[in-house]
Amino acid sequence: MTESTFPQYPRLVLSKGREKSLLRRHPWVFSGAVSRLEGKANLGETIDIVDHQGKWLARGAWSPASQIRARVWTFDKAESIDIAFFTRRLRQAQQWRDWLAKKDGLDSYRLIAGESDGLPGVTIDRFGHFLVLQLLSAGAEYQRAALISALQTCDPDCAIYDRSDVAVRKKEGMALTQGPVTGELPPALLPIEEHGMKLLVDIQGGHKTGYYLDQRDSRLATRRYVENQRVLNCFSYTGGFAVSALMGGCRQVVSVDTSQDALDIARQNVELNQLDLSKAEFVRDDVFKLLRAYREHGEKFDVIIMDPPKFVENKSQLMGACRGYKDINMLAIQLLNPGGILLTFSCSGLMTSDLFQKIIADAAIDAGRDVQFIEQFRQAADHPVIATYPEGLYLKGFACRVM
């Protein structure tokens, strides 16, 4: 494309000295770095980002109401943001997932992991031949048609379902959307396979895109700790950890969640895998309250899985989230038999691994128990983290031996 035919984009001019993160190829521009916008740009529209002297730095999407004023599509000045751009990004991402799916025998995985796959604000999960789309930023929404066209080019047989019904869209002035985009409607419960397990996924009504694919490897790792053990599975959702624990030979697994619908699917998942349902108990309750009740009644477990939802959405909530994580892990530690195993996780991006480890150490002190860290977890390999965007490493976890 020649200079004369190349699209002319509005220019976002940065304040002096605020270009360093872009020079290190971080994909976000925060409001405090912005000097002015030259030209007019609608919500989500493509803009060029330049330093205070006009030197070109990147091309991204404009979001005037967000603290993240721009999200970078490309650091290549010769790259236009069009259907061909999205097709290239999708094919690049698919190469890694194809290899991984063949190696691990997967029929479901994360195809696009936002910024780490060069598509900020875009999440795409594959469940069989269904692609579940979440557009979380203004730029992603603005490019919806181009992205869907690229998806159809890369996988013409896929059925696309939109799950952009997440509250974070409101922060950038967007309505929540959900429904079929192309192809057939997903069934109420779609069976997938994961490490020898069959699991039912609720694409239309489940959490996020229907299932937490990021915990795939952690669910598998659970099996080494549970043989002949009594297991407590907190925040169980649809029972992936419970099924894995039963496949690992546990004596009993108690799954706790506030959603009866999720617990009903968890029960179906146990039955689907022809596992002993008498070893599985399903409790609808608040985890904090139930753990305190178990402590009062002297209940004990050999393994506790603690996989709570995100406790922190922004920095102002971090201190409160730290207290929540400490309290819940303290209660879990108190309920474990000597030598018991705590498998504990945080999916909060603002919670670093070092901080999470310190919280568990503080919880152990408050519980009056010694704890050994014996294994560390992170999101599965279909959720890569690009080196210039450490925020992409949002899921962290530890296996702890409680003395």
From Swiss-Prot:
InterPro entries: PUA (IPR002478), PUA-like_sf (IPR015947), PUA_sf (IPR036974), RLMI (IPR023542), RlmI-like_PUA (IPR041532), SAM-dep_methyl-trfase (IPR019614), SAM-dependent_MTases_sf (IPR029063). CDD domains: AdoMet_MTases, PUA_RlmI, RlmI_M_like. It holds the Pfam family PUA_3. PROSITE patterns: PUA (PS50890). Keywords: Cytoplasm, Methyltransferase, RNA-binding, rRNA processing, S-adenosyl-L-methionine, Transferase. It is found in: Cytoplasm. GO terms for cellular component: cytoplasm. Residues 9-88 form the PUA domain. Its main location: cytoplasm. It catalyses: cytidine(1962) in 23S rRNA + S-adenosyl-L-methionine = 5-methylcytidine(1962) in 23S rRNA + S-adenosyl-L-homocysteine + H(+). Belongs to the methyltransferase superfamily. RlmI family. Specifically methylates the cytosine at position 1962 (m5C1962) of 23S rRNA. HAMAP family: 23SrRNA_methyltr_I. This is Ribosomal RNA large subunit methyltransferase I. It comes from Salmonella enteritidis PT4 (strain P125109).
